[in-house]
């Protein structure tokens, strides 16, 4: 069963919040503008498989929890009308949608967006996400963004713009199928929180953090790469901090061979700790 829902001239689309949607397989939503009540748990139904958006979100300030817990949803399709310029929070937006496999959020302009924490938390079958050309100049929080997305293999971060991003705790925590991550388009400052960011991503072979100016002091290595035993390429050439923490970061992670990009001054101090099978590129 499919449902086509339009926004009439004197009506608001928030009436969907009150629909009993258990028998609807596909939901197509058309309209010009959505009001601010169209948000938390709006689609919290066990029946929907696909949602198509043909409307403007400029009336919303949050999409928090919008698709949370949709147990049968497989795909969500956004058109160019999906405007998130006024959205400040997308926390838990797709969390616990355990059969969701595909989401394309490329080319989104989230100029007021500050948090995407837990956005895909426990989306167990999610395979790939396209974040390319995602513009979020005010984004600060991305903690647990993909936590325990066990089937996630690829995330496209090409031209991902988030210059103020600071909190990345457990961002890819136990993403055991993730093959590679290239975050070279993202530049962070030395106070970025990377606690357990890639913890137990044991399938990951390629990791590029070229422009991460992360400072390792005290206990701030925090198992960033713990359990990433299959890495064969890693660029942490902008990392700074105390040498013992650099050593721990590397030695708790690296397998017997691969390629690593490091600062020359770090290499001179820790070269005896790097496995002999590794090729070193110095910058």
Enumerate the predicted regions with their spans.
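Negatively charged
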Residues: 1-283
């Amino acid at each position: 069963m499919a449902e086509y829902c339009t926004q009439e001239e004197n009506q608001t689309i928030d009436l969907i919040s009150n629909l009993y949607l258990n028998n609807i397989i596909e939901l197509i939503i058309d309209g010009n503008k959505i009001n601010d009540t169209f948000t938390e748990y709006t689609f919290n139904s066990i029946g929907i498989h696909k949602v198509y958006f043909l409307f403007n979100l400029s009336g919303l300030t949050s999409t928090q929890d919008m698709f949370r817990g949709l147990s049968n949803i497989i795909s969500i399709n956004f058109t160019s009308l999906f405007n998130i310029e006024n959205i400040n929070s997308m926390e838990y937006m797709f969390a616990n949608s355990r059969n969701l496999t595909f989401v394309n959020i490329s080319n989104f302009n989230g100029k007021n967006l500050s948090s995407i924490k837990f956005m895909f938390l426990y989306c167990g079958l999610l395979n790939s996400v396209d974040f390319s050309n995602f513009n979020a100049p005010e984004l600060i929080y991305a903690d647990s963004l993909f936590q325990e997305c066990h089937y996630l293999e690829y995330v496209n971060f090409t031209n991902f713009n988030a210059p103020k991003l600071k909190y990345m705790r457990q961002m890819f925590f136990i993403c055991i199928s993730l093959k590679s991550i290239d975050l070279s388009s993202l530049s962070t400052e030395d106070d970025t929180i990377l606690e357990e960011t890639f913890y137990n991503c044991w399938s990951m072979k390629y990791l590029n953090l070229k422009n991460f100016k992360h400072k390792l002091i005290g206990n701030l290595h925090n198992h960033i790469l713990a359990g990433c035993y299959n890495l064969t390429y890693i660029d942490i050439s902008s990392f700074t901090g105390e040498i013992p923490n650099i050593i721990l970061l590397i030695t708790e992670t690296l397998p017997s061979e691969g390629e690593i990009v490091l600062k020359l001054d770090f290499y001179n101090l820790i070269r005896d700790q790097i496995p002999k099978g590794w090729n070193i590129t110095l910058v």
